[in-house]
Amino acid sequence: MMPLGEICFDFDRMQLVIPASYTPTPTYAPNFYRSPQRLYHLSLTDGRSGRKIDANVDTGASGTILTNRYYKKNENCFTGRTATDSLRMAGVGGVNVVKTIPVSWTFTLAGEQYTETNIPVVTSSEQNEEYDCRIGLPTLMAHRKFIINFKNMWMRFED
């Protein structure tokens, strides 16, 4: 994907667009990097803690979650809350059932604030995620467009 320079998921038209010229670089760029595991980690500001967190953009994921890594870093934010839900998560190693706490979550990306009204926070997991949040396809599709610029390493939603 990197040789393409820039791609745009246009959800209004249900198209993947590779523009002839790059979108001008915004002031917040760069806001993502490629991890040693070859994942693209997007830098978000977490509305709960106010800190920067790493999100993995996964167009194949069926939903957005806050990972066990996030939970461990922010356990004090969930004092008095009990994991009342569970989630079946499938991956290369098979299927795991993990305990979750459903929350409303606010984050800032590219200077804009967004809210997910009901996403799970994984409180126990056998996986060692390298990121705090996984952004899945439903979150991406909630916006008109999602632009990824590989040349200057930035991502953003357009509404």
Model-assigned labels for residue ranges:
Residues M1-D159:
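Pepsin/retropepsin-fold aspartyl endopeptidases
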